[in-house]
Amino acid sequence: MLTPRVLRALGWTGLFFLLLSPSNVLGASLSRDLEHPILSFDPSNISINGAPLTEVPHAPSTESVSTNSESTNEHTITETTGKNAYIHNNASTDKQNANDTHKTPNILCDTEEVFVFLNETGRFVCTLKVDPPSDSEWSNFVLDLIFNPIEYHANEKNVEAARIAGLYGVPGSDYAYPRQSELISSIRRDPQGTFWTSPSPHGNKYFIWINKTTNTMGVEIRNVDYADNGYMQVIMRDHFNRPLIDKHIYIRVCQRPASVDVLAPPVLSGENYKASCIVRHFYPPGSVYVSWRQNGNIATPRKDRDGSFWWFESGRGATLVSTITLGNSGIDFPPKISCLVAWKQGDMISTTNATAIPTVYHHPRLSLAFKDGYAICTIECVPSEITVRWLVHDEAQPNTTYNTVVTGLCRTIDRHRNLLSRIPVWDNWTKTKYTCRLIGYPFDEDKFQDSEYYDATPSARGTPMVITVNGSFGIGCNFRVGDNHDCPMFIHSTRKIFDYNLIVM
């Protein structure tokens, strides 16, 4: 054939063909229908040795182009854009083309998975294999490069089982959802040796090259981010656009955890210890496994009260929280609680750990009593940072209205002390609620408090109540203890009749 001889004369061996960015592409539109893909675009040539082919037309011509040579064969090419396809006829080589249609094509890629870290470049290489080989291999086939994104949704799930004793995790595949596929590029070669491609919709995101000598195609995915997680399809089609081979190469976007922290909130003596392990900003979800240790020994979470959940932050990655509950005897010292985190992707593994020791608080003893016109609060065995706040009818009182003193050290708990605080009672002839509250514990504000009512009513006092009445009226009734008194009153507005005292027993 004429074309192979011409290309061999130009230096077939060692040539690299580069699919450049859309700056070298004239513009195109591609059908997204993957079941029946139809090419409809104005193709652009792929450069040879970095220089564009000058004789390649701007767009496929609707006219037939004939090329005569000194040989007895005529090579005719017909390009039809109205049918959205290329038709290649070679009258002198019908037998050769007939043989080519029976060739067995295949695509061999150097990997099935590409693990690439965030903001870096992922690469893979695929080789076209045709048995038996011929110079027209590329002319008979089309290569489509299709990207199928996979995204993760933020969900919550309790731990169901341990993969290893004490090792828990959330399977990321449970939360993986495919998105709409996207045709990245469609590559074909005409009988003159020129490679054509559709423009990439992502600018310089994808870089594709072809080596005609080794029949290999390389793909680079630059500046990888979370949206690049998914798999590439390399689809080989025949010149009738029928799919022959479909290879999948998974693009695994990777990000090691940015930080690991253990939070162990304070507890009261005798209450269970609780801890949370927070693994921040990793990818993908499901790549992190958490195990727990208590004083260096394996601690196993309980499925009925412990678990893990995660969420995804756009631009930052996934965050996982794992929890554990441990017993508290109330006698032993608080344990060292450790979280061991293993991040795994393929053959890569990264481990880290964090530790926390919870603070244990002891129950204080409070008592409230009234004496000599004061509400007196006695407190035993509190840490030095604890103070007292008084409330009257649940309203906080200024600290200038009461005083608190240290009365000594606690005999049963080291570095704890005893307090006494008092506030004057209100002599307002009613019942008044007084509350002595301890402030400074890392629990609910009303966790430690005592409340009592001070009864200042006359009946509670058990003494006569003297009422002085000044008035200009007359009154006519007799008072007896225990009676209900309905007394008629005669009011005189001009003069004062008398002053008197009513004594009610």
UniProtKB/Swiss-Prot annotation:
It comes from the Viruses. Residues 51-85 are annotated as: Disordered. Pfam families: Marek_A (PF02124). The keyword Secreted applies. Residues 1-27 form the signal peptide. It is found in: Secreted; Host cell membrane. One of its GO terms (cellular component) is extracellular region. It is a single-pass membrane protein. The chain crosses the membrane at residues 465-491. Residues 61-71 have a biased composition (Low complexity). Residues 28-464 are virion surface. Keywords: Glycoprotein, Host cell membrane, Host membrane, Host-virus interaction, Immunoglobulin domain, Membrane, Secreted, Signal, Transmembrane, Transmembrane helix. Residues 257-355 form the Ig-like domain. Residues 492-505 are cytoplasmic. Glycans are attached at residues 45, 90, 99, 119, 211, 353, 399, 428. May play an immunoevasive role in the pathogenesis of Marek's disease. It is a candidate for causing the early-stage immunosuppression that occurs after MDHV infection. Belongs to the herpesviridae glycoprotein C family. This is Envelope glycoprotein C homolog.
